[in-house]
Amino acid sequence: MSESGSGSERDNEPDREATPAEKVATLRSDPVLASAIDEHGILEVEPAADPFERMVTSIVNQQLSVASAAAIRERLFETAEITPEGILAADEAELRKCGLSASKVSYVKNVAEAFASGELSISDLETRSNEEIIEELTGISGIGNWTAKMALMFVFAREDVFPVEDLGIRNAIEAGYGEHTRAEMQELSTRWKPYRSLASLYLWRTVD
């Protein structure tokens, strides 16, 4: 076979998706991330096994410390069946006893109703752009930009999400890079494209 023929065949091959190690390697030019990579190894952005449970977890986590959120999640998961039907059937007073605020009880029930009614369909959203998914999710009371971005990362495994709304991310960037405004952080994040979700995983590790 001639060299030109061989090259033509290669040109027609479909693009190969980068391996987890190759994706991580693109972030190593950043010294802060390189140090986190050395410490924590290869991380991956992976879809949740249970999208509804992941959405409930994100709502519980809203504006709470890691320890407080973990304690509430543990009580909630012991008290209620974490399915749309289980949350809808759960007594509001019992959910409050788990440590959920009245507003968060309303939020998890809103999400449960959206799942149960078919208003929120993960399979339908999988084909949408990040912006379209955020618009759809934030139409549900209790889901703001932060929760929607957590869904993009941990339900849909979208690889180029930068959750500047997240306090842990902002703390990590302030400590590691000295940037203090959200606009500065957004600008900084462009160096991590197209793997800003992956970069975020490492940033969280730096402040754990």
Show the residue positions of the predicted features.
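Long, compositionally biased
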Residues: 2, 118, 122, 135-136, ...
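Short pre-active-site segment immediately N-terminal to the catalytic Zn-binding motif
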Residues: 124-141
